[in-house]
Amino acid sequence: MTTPTPLRSVTVNTPPPYTIAIGPGLLHDPPRLAATIRGRHALILSDSEVAPRYAAQLHETLLRARPDLHLNVFTLPAGETSKSLENFGAAIAQLATLGATRDACLFALGGGVIGDLTGFTAACWMRGIDYVQVPTTLLAMVDSSVGGKTAVDIPQGKNMVGAFHPPRAVIADTDTLATLPLRELRAGLSEVIKYGAIRDPVFFHWLQTTREALLARDPAALAQAIARSCEHKADIVGRDPLEKGERVLLNLGHTFGHAIETTQGYSTPGSNNLNHGEAVAVGMVLAARLSNTLGLAPAEDTETLKNLLDAYGLPTVLPSGLKPETLLERMRLDKKNIAGRLRLVLWRGIGHAEAVPDVDEAAVRQILAN
């Protein structure tokens, strides 16, 4: 007899605090979902991959608990290209048509793209309304749904237009991971590995020994990976909600990764372009190699990180055809830079990272070229 996976809960102590609920069956929990709604209007935002599977269930559960609710569903095409100013405007128009007031609530049903767009829409409508993250990808469960960063992309860069706006709650129904494509599961595991790499050697070792169970979607292993990742992010975000200090460490691999994404073009369903988790995996290896070159991290730890990412089926080398100078141009636009100088999150070995200002571009160029 299979032991049921217990519900896990993680509190994020930002102003205001909120709770991350992690476990199976949460899309079928009317009291939990209804408790997040203060007013009479709600809008579910989802995408063309997720909505056919889960939007009707969320819609039904909400109306079962709140029959008086004015509730619509807005579905966007799947993929990073939907995280645009155009679709932000379309979501705002949906709220206007709904007649949403300041006590309305948005539900982000999907991955990081939907979560970011929904959060930014909530931050802007009437100067800020509630939204609930209902992540359906592993990457969104462990990273983008937690912390209150919201944004859309522009052609010049990823997440360039955004706001800090914490969700009212995060409700992560782990049953949705059963339908997640393997490539997307691996992308989420890239962000899970990041937490071990930057601050938890014990978790890093656990990921080395639990690979088969995680890739096989063992419910207990996945719940543990999600909960531990969320605990790490909640701990950091609770102390640094606006990324003025240590929260920047969560960006290990992201400066390189965002440059890869914007240079190659954003990944869409069926595309061979690297998705976010894959680009971060490559970025972590590049950051580790640069750290080794600068004398910050031991070479054997860099090799250990690369081997772990390889073992999970993640890419660890730059895609062919990306020019170092083009990538550097994108990196110069990164939000973490100071006074026009590169500021990168680099590595001190397994379990340790630091933000390094004024990184030598020649050293970065050499890493990108090799």
Curated annotation (Swiss-Prot):
SUPFAM superfamilies: Dehydroquinate synthase-like (SSF56796)
InterPro entries in alphabetical order: Dehydroquinate_synthase (IPR050071), DHQ_synth_AroB (IPR016037), DHQ_synth_fam (IPR030963), DHQS/DOIS_N (IPR030960), DHQS_C (IPR056179)
Pfam families in UniProt: DHQ_synthase, DHQS_C
Pathway: Metabolic intermediate biosynthesis; chorismate biosynthesis; chorismate from D-erythrose 4-phosphate and phosphoenolpyruvate: step 2/7
Chain sites annotated for binding NAD(+): 112-116, 136-137, 149, 158, 176-179
NCBIfam families, A to Z: aroB
Family, similarity comment: Belongs to the sugar phosphate cyclases superfamily. Dehydroquinate synthase family.
Functional description taken from the UniProt entry: Catalyzes the conversion of 3-deoxy-D-arabino-heptulosonate 7-phosphate (DAHP) to dehydroquinate (DHQ).
Protein name: 3-dehydroquinate synthase
Organism: Xylella fastidiosa (strain M12)
